[in-house]
C-alpha cells in the first residue's frame, strides 16, 4: 500500500513538472510583467502632470526600468542556468511586486494635487478676479513665499517612481533569459517556435489588461474620495488632468506576487520533452548523478565565462543581429513610449480614450500574429532560414507602409497668441509678446497662466481674462464666460472652459491612423518570432543563456535606457507653453507645436528602422553560406535521444512506456 501511494505521488509530481506546466506558469509571469510595463507606459503623461516634470525626465523614469534590468542581466543569464532557474524566476516576480508598490507610495506621502488655474473652486458672481477688469493691479511675478516653495519640493517624489521602476527592472531580469533557456533545454526543437509563440501571445493578455486598467484609472481623478469632483474646473481631456495612476500600481504589485508562487514548486531540471524517464533507475543512482553534476557545475561556473564571451563576439550573425535589434528597438521604444502623448496632442483625445484605443486596435492583431506564425512554423516545418527571409520581406513591406502616417495628420490647436493670431491667422512660430492684443491689454491679465477657454468663434484662449471676458455664469466645468471682447462672432461673444475640440475631419484621420496601426502590428508580430529563433539558433547550446543575456544587455544599454531620454528631450523642444509653478519654475508642458512634434515622432524612428535593414540583409547572406550552430546541435541531440529511446524500448518494459512511433520516422531523422 505504501509503495502504491509513493508511486501515485511520484506520478503527480512528474505530471506537474512537465514542460507545458512550466510554460503555463511562465506565461503567467509574462502576463504580470507585461501588465506592469504597459500600465507604466500608459500612465507616463499622468506622472508627468502629477509631478510637473518635463518629458525628458519622464523618459528617464521610463528608461530606469532598463537600468535595473541592466544591473544583473549578464550575471543572471550566465550564472542563473547553473542555479535553480524556476526559483530565481519566482524571486524575480516578488521583487517586481515590491517595485510596483514603491511606485505608488508618493500618492500617500504627498498632499493633494493642485492644478494651475485662475479660477477658485468657490468662484461665484461676486468673486471675479479671474476676469477682465480695467485699472487692476495684478502681480505678474510668481510668488516667492518660502512655505509655498517648500510645498512644491514634494514634486521631487517622482524619485520614488524612478527607484521603484529600477527595482521592477531588477525583478524582471531572470524571467526571460532563464525561462526561455529552460524551455529550450527541455522542449523538442520543433516545438520551440510554437511555445515561444504561445508565450508571446499570452504576454499580450498583460498589455490588454494593463491598457484597460490604465484607461479606467485615467478617468478617475487622482484625489478621488478626498476632494469634491463637482468643484473641478477641468475634464479628462484637459492637459492638467491627472488620473488615479497609483491605483493600477497597487494592482500590479498584487498580481506579480501571486504569479511568483508556482515557480517555487518546479524542479531544477525536467526530462527532455517526448522522451520517458528510465523509472527503473534506482533513487540512489539519481542522487549520485545529481551530486556529480553539481560538483562539475561548481568547478566550471566561472571558467567558461570568458571563452563564451569571446565565442559570441566572434559570431558575425550574432553581432549583426545585436546591431539590428539595437536600431529596431530604438525606433520601437521611441514610438511606443510616447504614442499616447502623440495621439492626445495630434487628435485631441484624452489619455483614457487613447489608452483604450491602443489596447483594442493594436494588441489583438499582435496576439493573433504570434500564434499564427508559431503554428505555421511547426505545422509546415519551416526552417529558421526560410522564416528569416519571410520575416525580412514582410518587415520591409510594413516599414514602407508606415510612411502613410505622414499623410494622416491634424493641425495645431487654434490658440490665440500661441498658434494663431487673435484674428485667426496661424503663426509660423510662437511669439510670446503676441499673447497680449488690443482687445485685452486693458484687462491686466496674467500672461503665463494656462487656464484655456473655447470661444464660440472656434478659437481657444489661454485664459478667460486673455479672451477679454467680463462676466461668468455657472460653477465648475459648467462655467460660461460672457461679454468677451476678443471673441468676434455673430453670437454673444461667450466662451466655455477647455480647449476647442478638433473638427470631424481630424476624427476621420484618427481612424485611418488606427487602421494602419492594426496592419503594422500584425506584420510586426509575424516577423518577431522568426527573428527570435535566429537569435536562439545562431549560438551554441552551451552559450544560449549567456547569448540571450548579452543580447538583452546590449539592447538595453544602447536602446532601452537612452532612447526615451533623448526622444523626450527632443519632444520638449516642441513645447509652445510650459505650466508655471508657484515659485516660477516651469512645470509640465501644456501644449506642443504638433507639426514639429509629428516630424520628430515619425522621422527619427523611420531613419532608425531604415538603417536596421542593412545589417539584417547581411545576416541573410551569412545564413545562406553557413549552418546555424543551434540547428547542428538540435539535430545531434535528437539523434542521440532517438537512439537512446529505441534502446530503452528494446531492453526494458517499464509501466507500459510507449515505443518509437515507427521505424520510417526514425530513419528519416537519422
Swiss-Prot record:
It is found in: Cell membrane; Basal cell membrane. The keyword Transmembrane helix applies. Glycans are attached at residues 124, 135, 483, 492. Keywords: Cell membrane, Disulfide bond, Glycoprotein, Ion transport, Lipid transport, Membrane, Transmembrane, Transmembrane helix, Transport. Residues 1-20, 81-86, 185-203, 268-311, 378-381, 537-545, 624-670 are cytoplasmic. It is a multi-pass membrane protein. The chain crosses the membrane at residues 21-40, 60-80, 87-111, 156-184, 204-224, 243-267, 312-333, 354-377, 382-405, 514-536, 546-571, 606-623. One of its GO terms (molecular function) is organic anion transmembrane transporter activity. The keyword tRNA processing does not apply. It holds the Pfam family Kazal_2. It catalyses: taurocholate(out) = taurocholate(in); glycocholate(out) = glycocholate(in); taurochenodeoxycholate(out) = taurochenodeoxycholate(in); tauroursodeoxycholate(out) = tauroursodeoxycholate(in). Residues 433-488 form the Kazal-like domain. InterPro entries: Kazal_dom (IPR002350), Kazal_dom_sf (IPR036058), MFS_dom (IPR020846), MFS_trans_sf (IPR036259), OATP (IPR004156). Residues 41-59, 112-155, 225-242, 334-353, 406-513, 572-605 are extracellular. Expressed in brain, choroid plexus and lung, but not in liver or kidney. It comes from the Eukaryota. Its main location: membrane. One of its GO terms (cellular component) is basal plasma membrane. Disulfide bonds join 439-469, 445-465, 454-486. One of its GO terms (biological process) is monoatomic ion transport. Na(+)-independent transporter that mediates the cellular uptake of a broad range of organic anions such as the endogenous bile salts cholate and deoxycholate, either in their unconjugated or conjugated forms (taurocholate and glycocholate), estrone 3-sulfate and prostaglandin E2, at the plasma membrane. Responsible for intestinal absorption of bile acids. Capable of thyroid hormone transport (both T3 or 3,3',5'-triiodo-L-thyronine, and T4 or L-tyroxine). A conserved histidine residue in the third TMD (His-107) may play an essential role in the pH sensitivity of SLCO1A5/OATP1A5-mediated substrate transport. Belongs to the organo anion transporter (TC 2.A.60) family. This is Solute carrier organic anion transporter family member 1A5. It comes from Mus musculus (Mouse). The lineage of its organism: Eukaryota, Metazoa, Chordata, Craniata, Vertebrata.
